[in-house]
């Protein structure tokens, strides 16, 4: 079989950068054990991924959504901790009795990296 070229794939995915991302993601999926949608023909995983894109046997939008999901980094544990800390601060009445000067010092301390005193 003839080698696949980028020009064959650009007809299916017009943006070359998106093509690189999609084909690399598909090649990683193949390396991880995903089933092949075309015959391997002794080709390496990136070439197989490009052939799948060129032959239009892979769902481009589905592959794009999978790629976006894997690139997103959401640390839900940290978000939950921050929300709990905010709720605890709102429930604590002592910060409501803080003077304006104390508030400014606390904010400057946070800004300066936690230093309590300036030298």
Curated annotation (Swiss-Prot):
What are the BP-aspect GO terms?
DNA-templated transcription
Which transformation does this protein catalyse, written as a reaction?
A: RNA(n) + a ribonucleoside 5'-triphosphate = RNA(n+1) + diphosphate
The question of whether Hydrolase is a record keyword is answered with no
Q: Which GO terms describe its molecular function?
A: DNA binding; DNA-directed RNA polymerase activity
What does it do?
Promotes RNA polymerase assembly. Latches the N- and C-terminal regions of the beta' subunit thereby facilitating its interaction with the beta and alpha subunits.
Task: Name the family.
Answer: Belongs to the RNA polymerase subunit omega family.
Name the NCBIfam families for this protein: rpoZ
* Official protein name in the record: DNA-directed RNA polymerase subunit omega
């Amino acid at each position: 079989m003839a080698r696949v070229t980028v020009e064959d794939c650009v007809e299916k995915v017009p943006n070359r950068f998106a093509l690189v991302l999609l084909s690399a993601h598909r090649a990683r999926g193949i390396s991880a054990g995903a089933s092949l949608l075309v015959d391997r023909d002794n080709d390496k995983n990136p070439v197989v991924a490009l052939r799948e894109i060129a032959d239009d046997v892979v769902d481009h939008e589905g592959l794009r959504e999978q790629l976006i999901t894997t690139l997103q980094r959401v640390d839900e544990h940290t978000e939950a901790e921050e929300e709990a800390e905010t709720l605890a601060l709102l429930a604590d009445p002592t910060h409501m009795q803080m003077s304006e000067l104390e508030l400014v010092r606390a904010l400057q301390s946070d800004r300066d990296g936690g230093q309590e005193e300036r030298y």
